Amino acid sequence: MTRSVDVRTRDRGQDATVDPAAFWAGDWATALGRHGERAAEDALLLDLAPLTIRVDGRPWTLRVGADGLEAQAGVEGAAVVDLDEEAFADLVREERTALGLVIAGRVGGAGPAHELFCAWDPVLRSVLDGRHLHRPGEVTLLTPDGAPLDLDQRFHLDDGREAPAHFLAEAGFALLCDVFTEAELDGLDAELAAAVDAARPDDGASWWAATSGGERYPCRILDLVEQSPGLRALLDDPRFLAIGQVLDDGHRPGDPFGEHFSDLTAEGLLKRVGSVEGLACLPWHKDCERGGHSMFCSGLTIGICLTPVDLAHGGLDVVAGSHRAHIARRQVDAGLDLPVATLAADRGDVTVHLSCALHRSTHPTSAERRVIYTGFALPARPGDAEADGADHARLLRERAAIAGRQDDAMASLQRPS
């Protein structure tokens, strides 16, 4: 049975102009007519206080009223966020989520208002896109025959496509064993080490962390594909290309976040024991959490394991089936009914997870972890527009700025939002 993970509903490159007053009176009101009842239930589920979104000085307040969700002109309560029209348009079209705008430094207002803004974001999507919040029992994990899915399965490239395709589409992740040779891994290790040595804190192309002993080190090299000839060769290797062909969605080597479509991207991650500061490990998140889900998902994020993935080296946990659920941060904090799979991989294995699968990395306890993340993007739709040079530069700056604003990013990811 063919399984698809292409859940796109919106073309990239739509008209960038969104007039706030016309939006609230027009598109918003129309969407409320279609999805408002369930979206109001979502807002009540999250226990959301009123939030005022002020766009270039013009305020509208979101709240749950007696008749459901309301967007009223004016200010109500203390929680006010400020956006310009470009940021508001990005929010409406889901080019950026509330979290993505906060991380990019494009939201005015106080910190608590930022948290409430992020908390309202899933309800905005519930209204505008009909993506309602997950309820217990809505996602099941089954084999093609209807039996419970064994989440500890491992696959090889010569197993054929049917079994890994079903598992990946059902669970949102997969583990492929023995993909690359020791010689190839040694070459990648050497090129990653050279990139780490060349990195500087202000280079705009790396994230930095610190250990309890005070050592600062580059924990993520953002432009590794440009610094690693060996990696570029492997990304054109039939073994790697076969991973993108497991599903029938036409995935091709490219940015797994979707933002750069067919541009090859790769990041080298280094996680040292005792890291206590920085973004060496990310808490529970979806790769599309900063925006673009309705335009790009699901891409395939590929992790080339240069060290084992285990308790000693640090792990990778995935909430199985979470790519098929719209999940708010407050639901994550309260606990989900979906099982958590803890991946155990060896050097040379490859992890695969979908861009909208909820996952986290855990700190190493006794040995350094090294991994290279790259991936596959869905092919552009007929109405899509590739990012131009200015967009490309902005995307790179925003990606680099995540670490520069790590306190805000971690707060938004870890606290109820």
List where the protein language model places each region:
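Conserved double-stranded beta-helix
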Residues: 2, 323-417
